[in-house]
Every structure is written in structure tokens, then in C-alpha cells.
């Protein structure tokens, strides 16, 4: 799994050197942000179902045509799969918060996602809308500390950009 620490060590090892001062500063910054990431991960884990449902509802409200016969959200099975996918992305964001890097997202969520959706004829815009809603709904200090919200939002942005 890729994290800041494993990335720094792997890069130094590949170059046949010890980690540089800037490498170690990067690791130190990641460690200093760990408490905020864990706060965000804990809140997300506790509220995953509610966050996913609100995000799903916002996406379907914007893209209501998807409920029409023959569209991507026209059956209960399709609706359940869409909600499942949103939960999957949020769970991977949770894992990424814990490890302090994008490894879980890169390995289990982003690699090949657009091709899969295109092959299945699924639009990515509703997923972008759902994740954007989750990002825009977060509020400091109501939901999370400012730093925890920043960590959470940066990973949401990472996924949104990969789907866009």
C-alpha cells in the first residue's frame, strides 16, 4: 500500500541513497497531519451510510433523468449499485485517510474506473456530483476540525478529478 512513508523510502532505495532532508520533512508533515486524518476517518466511518445516502440523493436530484426507463438508475438493482459505488469511494477515502496517502484509492478505486463505466454505459457525472455534494456539505467546526476537513476534502477532490 502506498503512503508518504513507503513512497519516500521506495524512491530513496531506487536511487541508492538514504532519504534526503526534504524527504524526511515530507514524512514529518504527514505524521503531523495524522491526528486530523484520523479524526476525519473516524467521523466518516461513523456516518458513512448517511453521508453516502445524502450524496446519492443529491446526485439523483440533479440527474433525475437517470430514473427514466432504460437509464442507469431506472431499477432498484441499479439504484442499489449506484449507492454501493458511492459507499465504496467513501470507504476508500476512509482507508486513504488512515494510511496518509492515496494508495487505496489508486489501487482499488481509480485504476481503470473510467473505462469500466464507459464500457458499462454508466455516466460518471452523477458520481462527481455525489462526491462534490459530500465535499461541499462538510463544515468546520460543526462536522470536523478545519485540518480534518481539509484532509477529507483533498481526497474527495482527488477522486472527483479522477472521474472528471
Swiss-Prot record:
Compartments, record wording: Cellular thylakoid membrane
One GO cellular component term noted in the UniProt record for this chain: phycobilisome
Keyword field contains Glycosyltransferase: no
Binding positions for (2R,3E)-phycoerythrobilin 1 per the UniProt entry: 82
BP GO terms, sorted: photosynthesis
Keywords attached to this entry: Antenna complex, Bile pigment, Chromophore, Electron transport, Membrane, Photosynthesis, Phycobilisome, Thylakoid, Transport
Annotated residues for binding of (2R,3E)-phycoerythrobilin 2: 139
Similarity comment: family membership: Belongs to the phycobiliprotein family.
Protein's name according to its UniProt entry: C-phycoerythrin alpha chain
Organism: Synechocystis sp. (strain PCC 6701)
Taxon lineage: Bacteria, Bacillati, Cyanobacteriota, Cyanophyceae, Oscillatoriophycideae
Encoding gene per record: cpeA
Amino acid at each position: 500500500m502506498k503512503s508518504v512513508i513507503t513512497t519516500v523510502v521506495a524512491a530513496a532505495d531506487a536511487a541508492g541513497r538514504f532519504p534526503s532532508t526534504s524527504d524526511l520533512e515530507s514524512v514529518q508533515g504527514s505524521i503531523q497531519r495524522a491526528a486530523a486524518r484520523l479524526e476525519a476517518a473516524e467521523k466518516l466511518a461513523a456516518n458513512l451510510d448517511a453521508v453516502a445516502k445524502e450524496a446519492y440523493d443529491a446526485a439523483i436530484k440533479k440527474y433525475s433523468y437517470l430514473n427514466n426507463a432504460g437509464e442507469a438508475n431506472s431499477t432498484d438493482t441499479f439504484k442499489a449499485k449506484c449507492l454501493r459505488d458511492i459507499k465504496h469511494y467513501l470507504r476508500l477515502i476512509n482507508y486513504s485517510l488512515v494510511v496518509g496517502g492515496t494508495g487505496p484509492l489508486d489501487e482499488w478505486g481509480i485504476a481503470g474506473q473510467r473505462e469500466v463505466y464507459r464500457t458499462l454505459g454508466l455516466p460518471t457525472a452523477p458520481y462527481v456530483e455525489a462526491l462534490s455534494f459530500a465535499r461541499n456539505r462538510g463544515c468546520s467546526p460543526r462536522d470536523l476540525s478545519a485540518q480534518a476537513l481539509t484532509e477529507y476534502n483533498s481526497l474527495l477532490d482527488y477522486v472527483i478529478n479522477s472521474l472528471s
